Amino acid sequence: MVEQYLSVFLKAVFVENLALAFFLGMCTFLAVSKNVKTAIGLGIAVIAIETITVPANQLIYSLLLKKGALTWVNDYLISTDTYNFAEVDLTFLGFISYIGVIAAMVQILEMFLDRFMPSLYNALGIFLPLITVNCAILGASLFMEQREYPFGESVVFGFGCGVGWALAIMALAGIREKLKYSDVPPPLRGLGITFITVGLMSLAFMSFSGIQL
């Protein structure tokens, strides 16, 4: 059991890193990686959101959305001749359900940071509410559904996805701070050298792809 959880976690962090393997959440990844302190704050926020929303969406999927999930409703019906809930398939509601859960969690996190950590709240600015539509957050829930992780593994997977994304943005922020003091050719300054850096980081993480866990 522990080995399985460890395998899911390490794959989510290194082998299947959402930012550097699937290039999810690139908008926020590039925009908030100019400063290490801000990147750490956003990374922690993403870890919290992923750890909560992935298992929450797993419960919604397994108990309500997937085909046969509503079989328990038949126990409360007098007769199943008219309608049999065992045949109901609501997976088409997955996107809107997952986004609703993510939006609610981000709103709670936003209120928490505004109340207790106003400096970080102001530093993140518009990118904090944009976590709601960050495809890395939604992508983790969709991967969970596709791979049909049970609840325990979905918690570990969500945490691992958040840690992997946070690790990537903090590493990029550290490199970009060093690049400020480097002699970068004028045409490549700004996003140009940043794209090259992200590409090299992605190539480095590809070395983990051959690991079997």
Swiss-Prot record:
This is Na(+)-translocating NADH-quinone reductase subunit E. Composed of six subunits; NqrA, NqrB, NqrC, NqrD, NqrE and NqrF. The keyword tRNA processing does not apply. The chain crosses the membrane at residues 12-32, 40-60, 92-112, 124-144, 155-175, 191-211. One of its GO terms (biological process) is respiratory electron transport chain. The gene is nqrE. It holds the Pfam family Rnf-Nqr. It is an enzyme of class 7 (translocase). GO terms for molecular function: oxidoreductase activity, acting on NAD(P)H, quinone or similar compound as acceptor. InterPro entries: NqrDE/RnfAE, NqrDE/RnfAE_oxidrdctase, NqrE. It catalyses: a ubiquinone + n Na(+)(in) + NADH + H(+) = a ubiquinol + n Na(+)(out) + NAD(+). It is a multi-pass membrane protein. Belongs to the NqrDE/RnfAE family. Keywords: Cell inner membrane, Cell membrane, Ion transport, Membrane, NAD, Sodium, Sodium transport, Translocase, Transmembrane, Transmembrane helix, Transport, Ubiquinone. NQR complex catalyzes the reduction of ubiquinone-1 to ubiquinol by two successive reactions, coupled with the transport of Na(+) ions from the cytoplasm to the periplasm. NqrA to NqrE are probably involved in the second step, the conversion of ubisemiquinone to ubiquinol. Its main location: membrane. Its EC number is 7.2.1.1. One of its GO terms (cellular component) is plasma membrane. It is found in: Cell inner membrane.
